[in-house]
Amino acid sequence: MVAIFEFTCSCCGKLHEGSPSFGYKAPMHYEVLSEQDKQSLATLTDDLCEIDSPEGTDYFARVVLELPIHGVEEPFLWGVWVSLSEESFARYTSTWGEHDESDSYFGWFSNRLPYYPDTINLKTNVRPRNGGLRPYLELEPSAHPLATHYFEGLSIQEAQRIAEEVMHGGS
């Protein structure tokens, strides 16, 4: 197994070392709000988000999705957000730092990832972790390419293509 993932970027010519890791500061549902609505309807921290609306409150948690890279020890990491039910959000936040790591919360994927067809509302399970670690995200099986990469892994070439698209846009 290769110790570290590295590639020479076809866009900028730089050598990038270490498995790719990209993250989102907020769920897509927060990002589309006006600045006024962000101030009046939403609460956002590094790990949690709540958005009020006439229909009720939406709850989100920041999680980590790991995609294995064939022949590489460290996975491709996405820091993304998932929506949780009010009950799951309350249970998750009430056990902060003392989670039952065998617990699982159903959630909906809440960011659009580049390279992939629309990832909003992919079915997920959130697995809490202790020790200050963000929860681990499990995707439910589906025909979506992100789910395929989650279960079957990425080739080194695919990981490079995705990283280049995130860093430089377009493919």
Feature locations, PLM:
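A general marker of short, structured functional hotspots
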Residues: 9-12, 20, 26, 88, ...
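Short, surface-exposed linear patches
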Residues: 30-33, 87, 160-161
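Surface-exposed beta-strand edges and their flanking turn/coil or helix-capping segments
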Residues: 31-39, 75-78, 92-95, 151-152
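Charged, low-complexity interaction segments
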Residues: 45-128
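C-terminal, charged low-complexity interaction regions
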Residues: 94-171
